A protein has these predicted regions:
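Residue-level recognition of single "structural anchor" positions
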Residues: 1-154
Length: 154
């Protein structure tokens, strides 16, 4: 699991966490390669744990970076929680890495960066389309969409 910031490249002044006009996206990466994303109002512990509680089963082993918003997951009942310390230039260790979700962030930012001027109200739909395409990257999306339309006609 990880969070990422989406929005205009750089505006004078604020950068990184708390950059004014950026949208915060929280992402979960399952070991089978599937991603779930959700736009969150902030990256505080309470907000992130609400999403985690709703989407992650208690017997899961959690891998994250060292962001303080992830502290206390074992106390909530999760089996194990491994961290990598990005702040200390650690991106993988013997038991943990979050390269899967980092790969999705790179894919999403590259894909969404090609669309100039996404309105904030439409960002959610573009993000979910990107999530869908990433989750079905090995499938024939055309055939998959035809199948979905046959099952649930408009």
């Amino acid at each position: 699991m990880d969070e990422s910031y989406f929005g205009p490249k750089r505006i004078r002044g604020k950068r990184g966490r708390g950059a004014g006009s950026k949208s915060i996206v929280f992402g979960l990466f399952k070991r089978n390669g599937w991603v779930y994303t959700e736009i969150v109002p902030d990256a505080r512990k309470r907000t992130l744990q609400r999403v985690i509680r709703g989407k992650v089963s208690l017997d899961s082993i959690i891998h994250s970076d060292g962001w303080r918003g992830y502290h206390g997951l074992v106390d909530m009942g999760y089996a194990k929680h491994y961290r990598v310390a990005h702040g200390s230039n650690e991106f993988a260790n013997d038991i943990s890495h979050i390269n899967g979700i980092e790969s999705f962030w790179a894919y999403a930012k590259l894909r969404l960066g090609k669309i100039k001027g996404i309105r904030k109200e439409m960002f959610y739909l573009h993000l979910k389309e990107t999530e869908f395409r990433f989750n079905h990257r090995r499938d024939n999306v055309y055939k998959l969409l035809l199948k979905l339309l046959r099952e649930r006609p408009i």
